[in-house]
Curated annotation (Swiss-Prot):
Molecular function via GO: rRNA binding; structural constituent of ribosome
Subcellular location: Plastid, Chloroplast
Protein name listed in UniProt: Small ribosomal subunit protein uS8c
NCBIfam families for this protein: PRK00136.1
Lineage, uppermost ranks: Eukaryota, Viridiplantae, Chlorophyta, Ulvophyceae, OUU clade
Domain of life: Eukaryota
Amino acid sequence: MIYDTISDMLTRIRNAYLVKHETVYVLNTKINRKISEILKKEGYIESVNLSTNSLQKLEITLKYLGNQKKPGITNLKRLSWPGLRFYSNYKDIPPVLNGMGVVILSTSKGIMTDREARANKVGGELLCSIW
């Protein structure tokens, strides 16, 4: 039984990049779907689809750069987990690599990036950082 589906998804993506897989399958939950859509919108992964053989899986196609297949994501880091939650208002959201990376937040207006949260002037729980 997986209790933290976000950490499981991030770990599966990280491990798939390490062994240079083209696709990775993760649990199909609302929060995983929204985070993977943000990763696609920000250009870190190629595509997100529902798995054809199972309705409980998301199929994420990973993005590689250049002929040497360099990963599209350098680092994925879980910031808040079930045992220790981190919250921030919109003024105190930490920048990742001086704005080069992205922090994903869970706010009262849904899951969004740090830039969207600052623009909407809304804070929330810091879920993960990507660069």
